[in-house]
């Protein structure tokens, strides 16, 4: 019966916040370099905050009512990485609040950074005991230590904590460099990813571009050599993603496609930063086409997600008994 089913949204749904707020930040920056209103950027940021609030409420409610289901997600070799999206999006929301209400931004950042560090220490260090299955090695492994530390650096830059931002940036960069060879080796040589996991490949687009965005946040926005090199590697990853489109589009659209969104939105922001540094040249030429392209991708994701919501296919409901501990099923 429908009454026996309860809302069960996996932590991966926080990925919707990543791309939405990331594009909001891109439009905020666009309003500084172009004669466009800041309201579009602020509107996307507010939309992302609302989505984050709803998802956070659902996640906390599930944690309180069905802690066993959250524990199962945290212990899952693949899904556990996506749980780290909760502190990641909390820190992005903190960045969104910086121009409006700094004390709240500091509180959200403080909470998010403590949670992300604690979870990364528990989850990632736990993988070092040699029991992580090879088939569970996917780009999702970037999330706890790479994405979260880059976002921490971005938040530090927005709040003016430059030295702390550099520390987090270093943690993210070296985590990225240590993980990428392992992940690429698995993708190349250890069997094809199952269809349901192929959209996790979208995360592969993010590290270089989010690292570039984090570096620009802590270096005062200077489009220096390092920023351009990171951007270049991000563009190369974009070409790889385009090449593999038929492969990961072999499944119907679902919320997991938002894994591409944070890298895409970071492409927009970093492209604008580098392009606004001059009135001509390579980056100036790329800035507008890339900005249009990224807006097109995010718009498609928003429209398709809204369609899923209207069709009743977005909000996952699960039998109550499945979410309860075995001893509580009676």
From Swiss-Prot:
Biological process according to GO: monoatomic cation transport; response to antibiotic; response to tellurium ion; transmembrane transport
Cellular compartment(s): Cell inner membrane
Residues under site feature: Important for gating: 262
Which residues are exposed on the Periplasmic face of the membrane? 29-35, 99-101, 160-161, 219-224, 276-283
Q: Which InterPro entries match?
A: SLAC1/Mae1/Ssu1/TehA, TehA, TehA/Mae1, Tellurite_res_ion_channel, Voltage-dep_anion_channel_sf
Q: Look up and give the membrane topology term.
A: Multi-pass membrane protein
Q: Name one Pfam family in it.
A: SLAC1
Q: Which domain of life is it from?
A: Bacteria
Give the GO molecular function terms. Answer: identical protein binding; monoatomic cation efflux transmembrane transporter activity
- Whom does it interact with, and what assembly results? Homotrimer. Each subunit forms a channel.
Name of this protein: Tellurite resistance protein TehA
Native species: Escherichia coli (strain K12)
Tell me the lineage of the source organism: Bacteria, Pseudomonadati, Pseudomonadota, Gammaproteobacteria, Enterobacterales
């Amino acid at each position: 019966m429908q009454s026996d089913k309860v809302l069960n949204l996996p932590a991966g749904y926080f990925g919707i916040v990543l791309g939405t707020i990331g594009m909001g930040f891109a439009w905020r920056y666009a309003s500084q370099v172009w004669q466009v209103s800041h309201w579009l950027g602020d509107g996307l940021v507010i939309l992302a905050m609302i989505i984050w609030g709803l998802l956070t409420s659902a996640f906390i409610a599930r944690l309180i009512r069905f802690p066993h289901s959250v524990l199962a997600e945290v212990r899952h070799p693949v899904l556990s990485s996506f749980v780290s999206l909760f502190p990641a999006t909390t820190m992005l929301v903190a960045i969104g609040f910086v121009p409006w209400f700094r004390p709240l931004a500091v509180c959200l950042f403080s909470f998010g950074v403590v949670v992300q560090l604690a979870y990364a220490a528990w989850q990632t260090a736990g993988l070092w005991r040699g029991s992580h299955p090879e088939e569970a090695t996917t780009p999702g492994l970037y999330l706890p230590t790479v994405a979260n530390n880059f976002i921490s650096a971005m938040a530090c830059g927005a709040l003016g904590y430059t030295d702390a931002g550099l520390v987090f940036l270093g943690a993210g960069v070296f985590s990225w460099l240590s993980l990428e060879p392992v992940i690429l080796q698995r993708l190349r040589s250890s069997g094809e990813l199952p269809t349901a996991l192929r959209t996790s490949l979208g995360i592969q687009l993010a590290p270089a571009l989010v690292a570039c965005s984090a570096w620009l946040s802590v270096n005062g926005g200077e489009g220096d050599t390092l920023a351009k090199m990171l951007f270049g590697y991000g563009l190369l990853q974009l070409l790889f993603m385009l090449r593999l489109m038929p492969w990961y589009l072999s499944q119907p659209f679902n919320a997991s496609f938002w894994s591409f969104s944070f890298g895409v939105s970071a492409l927009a922001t970093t492209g604008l930063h580098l392009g606004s540094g001059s009135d001509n040249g390579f980056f100036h030429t790329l800035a507008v086409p890339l900005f249009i392209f990224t807006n097109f991708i995010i718009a498609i994701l928003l429209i398709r997600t809204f369609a899923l919501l209207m069709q009743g296919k977005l909000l996952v409901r699960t039998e109550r008994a499945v979410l309860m501990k075995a001893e509580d099923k009676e």
